[in-house]
Amino acid sequence: MSSTLIVQLDMRTLCQEADVTAECVIEIVEHGIVEPSGRTPEDWLFDDQAPLVTKRAVKLHQELELEWEGVALALELLQEVQQLRSENSMLKQRLGRFIQL
């Protein structure tokens, strides 16, 4: 029997983990970069990927001077590229099996 551990972070913990202010997190949420559960910032809970995504978003915003809309698009495209690379790798492995036959 396997058990699944679900990690959720509140606003304070996310701010500490990502080293950002609550105002910054609110902006990131407003632009759909991270999506918490809960209606208000006091009730928000974030998944375990939120600190990493938040750090990447802030880095793009600061270092490349992108607006938050641009950050959201860049992160979406980076995720799509990673997904396509994974799919390509899997397909290459499958193709390799057919070629060896």
UniProtKB/Swiss-Prot annotation:
Matches recorded under InterPro entries: CbpM
Pfam families reported in the protein's UniProt record: MerR_2
Top-level division of the source organism's lineage: Bacteria
Family: Belongs to the CbpM family.
Primary role: Interacts with CbpA and inhibits both the DnaJ-like co-chaperone activity and the DNA binding activity of CbpA. Together with CbpA, modulates the activity of the DnaK chaperone system. Does not inhibit the co-chaperone activity of DnaJ.
Descriptive protein name: Chaperone modulatory protein CbpM
Organism, as annotated: Pseudomonas putida (strain ATCC 47054 / DSM 6125 / CFBP 8728 / NCIMB 11950 / KT2440)
